[in-house]
Structure formats: C-alpha cells, structure tokens
Amino acid sequence: MKLDLKILDARMRDYMPAYATTGSAGLDLRACLDAPVTLQPGETTLVPTGLAIHLADPGYAALILPRSGLGHKHGIVLGNLVGLIDSDYQGQLMVSTWNRGQTEFVLNPFERLAQLVIVPVVQAQFNIVDDFAQSDRGEGGFGSTGRH
C-alpha cells in the first residue's frame, strides 16, 4: 500500500516512520520537539510528529498506539488510549502522551514515542430489528463466558 506522507518539519526527513523489523505491524512515530519535554506523574501533553498523512481511501484508517516498552517500563501511554486517524484527515499527526507512572519522564527530541498501524475499515449500515436471532451468549457480558 502506498500512503501519501507530508513532511511538515524538515528535520523529520532524517526520522521517517519505519517498521523496526520485517514482521512489525506498526510504523514508529517520533517526537518532533525542539527541546526535551518533562512529564510529571499524571501529566499529559500533546506531542507533534512533524508529519501528516492522507489515507484518502475510506476503506482504511490509521491507529496511533503506544509503544509497549514505554508503557511497561516508564508508564508512558496515550492520553486517549488509541488515536484514530480517519481516511479524510490531512492534519499533523499528534500524540496525546500521558505519564501514568510514579516518576517524571523526559521525552527527548526525535525519540520514538508511538506507533502507527494501518487497518481496514468497514462502514456498516444498520438494519433496524425488534429482536435478534437467539445466540448461545445472548446478553451475557463482562466475564459471562468464564474466567479460564
């Protein structure tokens, strides 16, 4: 799949989104910062990437997801948990960054911060019904299928 990418900050030419391995699902996104940013515990900030994409095809969307190492080791996750980039969005990719950890975290310029995953999208149409066809699960949820 070819994707239109606009470089909004010339410095990002040296830090293009890339797959870390041939098996990677996510492209690494980096913090386009002029100076380090310190996040105190519980603090959130919006971090620019210096990049914009245009998917154009409504059959696709992009997800901005946290990097597992930052979340596990430092408590750095996305403030909105998942960022959804619609196919018609053309603005800068921004990463809502939340320090849910117990200690301050310093985010350095051009540090890998999040990952971008391209996913297929189905735009559903609704069929209004009075009742659903019976299923084994029915309305059971929140652990109704068992613990193990």
UniProtKB/Swiss-Prot annotation:
<dbReference type="InterPro" id="IPR008181">
    <property type="entry name" value="dUTPase"/>
</dbReference>
<keyword id="KW-0378">Hydrolase</keyword>
<protein>
    <recommendedName>
        <fullName>Deoxyuridine 5'-triphosphate nucleotidohydrolase</fullName>
        <ecNumber>3.6.1.23</ecNumber>
    </recommendedName>
</protein>
<dbReference type="GO" id="GO:0006226">
    <property type="term" value="P:dUMP biosynthetic process"/>
</dbReference>
<dbReference type="Pfam" id="PF00692">
    <property type="entry name" value="dUTPase"/>
</dbReference>
<comment type="function">
    <text>This enzyme is involved in nucleotide metabolism: it produces dUMP, the immediate precursor of thymidine nucleotides and it decreases the intracellular concentration of dUTP so that uracil cannot be incorporated into DNA.</text>
</comment>
<comment type="similarity">
    <text>Belongs to the dUTPase family.</text>
</comment>
<dbReference type="InterPro" id="IPR029054">
    <property type="entry name" value="dUTPase-like"/>
</dbReference>
<keyword id="KW-0546">Nucleotide metabolism</keyword>
<keyword id="KW-0479">Metal-binding</keyword>
<keyword id="KW-0460">Magnesium</keyword>
<dbReference type="InterPro" id="IPR033704">
    <property type="entry name" value="dUTPase_trimeric"/>
</dbReference>
<dbReference type="GO" id="GO:0046081">
    <property type="term" value="P:dUTP catabolic process"/>
</dbReference>
<dbReference type="GO" id="GO:0004170">
    <property type="term" value="F:dUTP diphosphatase activity"/>
</dbReference>
<feature type="binding site">
    <location>
        <begin position="84"/>
        <end position="86"/>
    </location>
    <ligand>
        <name>substrate</name>
    </ligand>
</feature>
<dbReference type="GO" id="GO:0000287">
    <property type="term" value="F:magnesium ion binding"/>
</dbReference>
<comment type="pathway">
    <text>Pyrimidine metabolism; dUMP biosynthesis; dUMP from dCTP (dUTP route): step 2/2.</text>
</comment>
<feature type="binding site">
    <location>
        <position position="94"/>
    </location>
    <ligand>
        <name>substrate</name>
    </ligand>
</feature>
<dbReference type="InterPro" id="IPR036157">
    <property type="entry name" value="dUTPase-like_sf"/>
</dbReference>
<feature type="binding site">
    <location>
        <begin position="67"/>
        <end position="69"/>
    </location>
    <ligand>
        <name>substrate</name>
    </ligand>
</feature>
<feature type="binding site">
    <location>
        <position position="80"/>
    </location>
    <ligand>
        <name>substrate</name>
    </ligand>
</feature>
